[in-house]
Amino acid sequence: GVSSAASDVYKRQILFHAAAGGVGSFACQWAKALGVKLIGTVSSAKKAEYAKQQGAWATIDYSHENVAQRVLELTEGKKCPVVYDGVGKDTWETSLDCVAPRGLLVSFGNASGAVTGVNLGILSQKGSLYVTRPTLAGYANTADNLQKMADELFGMIAKGKLSVEIAQRYPLSEAATAQTLLSDRKTTGSTILVP
């Protein structure tokens, strides 16, 4: 999760793609609570404002800004020690360009499609990078680990450090509409279907 990968980059900058989405807005809050400066990618000025309200330190609007160039500017040329990429195919190469030497790319989703045909040699060319593809099952692999994670999450919510905002609700009969809006990046925060 955010806390385990960010623990040794306390008060440093991380990059998080899709910072105004459900997972991204939660990551903005969590990073801020940990004292980590989250740089979030977004697709509009409205989403940039939303991500900042959720705790993002800075945002990059990829619809008209060069993400890798802005990361260099925001980090004073150092890049980010950790990049979180839940988008996948569309952001893979940009993510690699934003990771600091010997840094970590956390590839946890594939909203734009799966990353395929990875040439491992690119990791050395970009600065001896590390890549991980975590799953919840890999971290919550025992009842004890699951309980620790739940305690941390609900503890943060109880302390008011995290809040879960349901930004859009759709009846189950409109699932196709909700999916289209999510795929077209027309939503912010979390979207739920109501039976």
Language model feature labels by segment:
Residues 1-6, 10:
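Single conserved hydrophobic/aromatic residue that forms the stacking wall/gate
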Residues 15, 83-84, 106:
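N-terminal Rossmann-like NAD(P) cofactor-binding module of classical short-chain dehydrogenase/reductase
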Residues 18-19, 87:
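NAD(P)H cofactor-binding loop motif with strongest signal on the N-terminal glycine-rich segment
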Residues 21-25:
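Glycine-rich NAD(P) Rossmann-fold beta1-alpha1 loop
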Residues 32-91, 142-144:
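Adenosine-nucleotide cofactor-binding segment
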Residues 34, 42, 90-161, 195:
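Glycine-rich phosphate-binding loop and adjacent beta-alpha segment
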Residues 76, 100, 186-187:
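Short conserved AdoMet
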Residues 143-195:
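C-terminal hydrophobic helical "lid"/dimerization subdomain
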